[in-house]
Amino acid sequence: MSFRFQIEATDGLARAGRFFTPHGEVETPVFMPVGTVGTVKGVPQDTLEELGVQILLNNTYHLYLRPGVETVRELGGVQKFMAWDRPILTDSGGFQVFSLSDLRKVTEEGVSFRSHLDGSLHFFSPESAIAAEIGLGADIIMAFDECTEYPAERARAQASMEMTLRWAKRSKEYFEAHKEEVPWFREVRDSPFALRSSPDERLGEQSASVGKQKQVPRGLTSARDDNPDLMAHDGTAEAVPFQSNSEHPGSGEERMANGEQREGQTQAIFGIVQGGTYLDLRRESAERTVELDFPGYAIGGLSVGEPREMTYEMVNAAIPHLPVEKPRYLMGVGTPEEIVQYVARGVDMMDCVLPTRAARHGLLFTSEGRVTIKNARYAKDEGPLDPRCNCKVCQRYSRAYLRHLYSSNELLAQVLNTIHNLAYYLDTMRRVRQAIKAGEFATFLSGVRPPHLSVL
């Protein structure tokens, strides 16, 4: 078995559980920081580990262009390349390709596009996109899909949905035929899988500590990250050696000793639900994608400019038609308040550039509301950014100092701001998981303040 998902508690539609991958287990609901080109901007991997990041998202389009799939494959896969031994998810590059607009041409076979780096011509088909994802070697990969713009006429949204369904079938067929080509396949298959201690156990330990102080894959043919707009609500890799970070009974070491089945011998591919902003198309897309029997399902094509309430409606339309026993991934969302709302609707996985992008523009998320750190009111503020936050930024630095760094265009401002925003998102999800397991999620949800009431 390559991928397994289990639900451990429910509260309403919200679920708490975990899934198992070749590079470790992930507790859900989970927020995945975006490391587009193999890095979360400004934050080294050891800091991400200290923050309790369980899984990262990398972008196939960007890594395909630079440094190239062949390079990453020869260096052992994306985990080994970026010195990160925890799980990674790659998107297929579809969203980035389709956002190029004037630089692309779509046919049934695939998409021709020009690189945003040098204008060179490239081609992605479902087969070549999956070949790239296999070559990169992430734990979870996405089927190749077509994203529609907003707004889109119904005929356009329906045609795109049909295309995505055909491409999903081709993506899965190619993956099934080539899944053993993942760079680390044989090492993981032949080695004990690292069943680590609970991510939340690791995070608790880390928080306490912080508080105290070879070939281009077949089918792949080759012929700017970071829009400052904040409107988003938006190969052989080393097998991970067995280690337990907890002496807690039932830890990974004990489960392995008891003979629990090893997981994660190759990648898992998720299908993507499309359908624009049409409820019936979203339902149809969900039902027909499920017929293809993926191990997990994503809801894509949202947070592209539509009103927030419309996003909620589209999620509500799709979720009931996705299998209860498989993870649900909502792509490209959202604010801290929104991700909690999506959990309430039954979503298990989310990613968004917002915490890192907003940090670089001086917008910080706190338990007291959003802080625009450049504001003059913070010039002599000796208090911490967030009195309730245990991240190393809030434990050490004042608002006045953070404002000084940002106003001086110091690189450290971006680093510290990003660390805090990620800590806030990750802590939010940790508290969500705890609330679901305690049967107190409704109470937790009622205490989440609306975004428009939380600006300082």
Roles of regions detected by a PLM:
Residues 1-18, 26-30, 42, 145-151, ...:
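C-terminal extensions of enzymes
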Residues 178, 182, 264-385:
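Glycine-rich phosphate/ribose-binding loops and adjacent secondary-structure elements
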Residues 24, 56, 91, 133, ...:
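Conserved, mostly hydrophobic/aromatic
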Residues 1-188, 262, 376-379:
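Non-catalytic, usually N-terminal nucleic-acid engagement modules in DNA/RNA processing proteins
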Residues 149-153, 158, 296-303, 411-414:
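Glycine- and acidic
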Residues 84, 89, 95-101, 107-118, ...:
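Active-site pocket-lining/capping segments in soluble small-molecule metabolic enzymes
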Residues 115, 265, 441:
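Long C-terminal interaction/binding lobes of large macromolecular proteins
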Residues 177-266:
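Intrinsic disorder/low-complexity segments
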